[in-house]
Amino acid sequence: MSSAVTMRSTTPVEAGLAASGLGFERPVPEGGYRWWYVDGFSDCGQFGVTLIAFIGSVFSPYYYRARHRGRGQAANHVSLNVILYGPSKSRWCMTERGDTALQQSPERLDIGPSALRAYDSGLE
């Protein structure tokens, strides 16, 4: 990454999402998916993080098979994918969970012990 690159962050309000929210509570149709994607970088530009929350995990071989067998309930294939980038190595983790691990509300998405929370000031 060049030191000339300037990273800009925005809050949901600045992005125009405050009125409509992030859609955490919206249902996902059978065989469908919904995801939320966030990138971040360190001030020095050498380290990064990507966070992807899924309802209907597009990377899941289990969801792929279930969809092709006519049993593709998106809520039964939820996951949180975290990737850490660095100058020497990158690491990632993803755990797929079933529908009992999913809790949804307009302000919050829980996947097992992990959660995303939407505030006017940002995402936590």
Language-model regions: role of each:
Residues 1-124:
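Targeting-peptide/extracellular-domain and disordered-appendage signature
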